[in-house]
Amino acid sequence: KRYFTANGKFRTGLLSRIVKDLEEIGAKDIEWENKPEQIEPFIPSVGNFKYREYQERAIYNCLKRKRAIVDSPTGSGKTLIMAGCIAALQWGDNPTGVVLFREKGILKQTYEFFKKCGIKDLGYNSGEGYVPGKIMLSTVQSIERIIDTHLKESEILMVDEAHQFCKGDTTIAAIESFPNASYRLAFTATPPREGAKDINARMVLEGAFGSVYTTRTAEDLIKDGALAKPIIQVVDNTPVSSVASDLTYLDIYDQYVVNCDVRNDKIKDIVSKVYRSNPNAKILILVKNLQHIENLQERISNCYTIEGKDDIDSRYDIINKFVKDNKAATIIGTNVMQTGISIDE
């Protein structure tokens, strides 16, 4: 696939890649018309939060470069980096900007965090509500509501969980819009790989946001003490000797995972063991469907559940009760728990 037109036009985020290619073939005296002025960034503090060194460096580079796909691992504080960038751009100014999300839950969580950071004139737009503001947090599904106020006016475009925006007509159209956004920043823990067989996802993101900037790896942050070192235990579950040939994958999953008493009892025993060893333990269990939630809830004491039918406020109310429970507790959720949800415990 070609990423430039017959007359040489290309997405501006690909400029650094194209310049590099030109240099590799010996091109010299490359001229760059209308090159943006380089301004030394000022980074103000936000709320009561203190930046780690790599977070402050990431904010500096985002502001200096104006475009970046920020590659930062889960737990590294991407949302604080986002808030720091916006706070810096609001210093002595009142810019218009949009932060796009795919998930309402992450939007709500980010909105509350940005308020704690002191982000000014903050707005909110999703299927569950609308609050006007110059810095508008919006789901891509509800973007039509802010077209008139933010499409041409926005000087800032940010995208959270950016790997979710490199496929699909609606999401790609969204990140390729906002023509006057001179600051274009995308944040993800899993950017599409450079050497992937399907390079299109990477090129779509780079075209809209520029090259990848890596903060620190998860391994680095574990060594620094910023992230806890995970302990992974693989629990043996003796496989069945044979499976009927006429069963579909879903039939097999229901029979040998969701409704398997031996397997579910083993999960119950593990939870009970943790409860006995730590009277304040907090356990998270992720499953794929509602029936599995019910099967485990019947077995596990002091158990909270989150399902897709729960609205955003209900989900956070349940999480808050779970975190503040003064006894050992378990929370079981489906895929609504699997992206970007922050649980302090």
Which residues does each predicted region cover?
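Conserved interdomain hinge at the start of the Helicase C-terminal
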Residues: C85-I86, S242-K288, E294-N295
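SF2 helicase motor core recognition
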Residues: T79, I143-T149, G225, I319-K324, ...
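Conserved helicase ATPase core of P-loop NTP-dependent helicases/translocases
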Residues: K108, K120-P132, K282-L286, E294-N295, ...
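Conserved helix/coil segment N-terminal to the catalytic DExD/H
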Residues: S126-I156, C166-A174
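Conserved Walker A/P-loop ATP-binding site and its immediately adjacent core
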Residues: S76-K116, R193, K288-I293
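Pre-Walker A (Motif I) flank of P-loop NTPase domains
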Residues: K64-V70, P95, P279-A281, A328-A329
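Post-DEXD/H (motif II) to motif III coupling segment of the RecA-like Helicase ATP-binding lobe
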Residues: H163-Q233
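Conserved pre-motif I regulatory segment
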Residues: R2-T5, D21, I30-D71
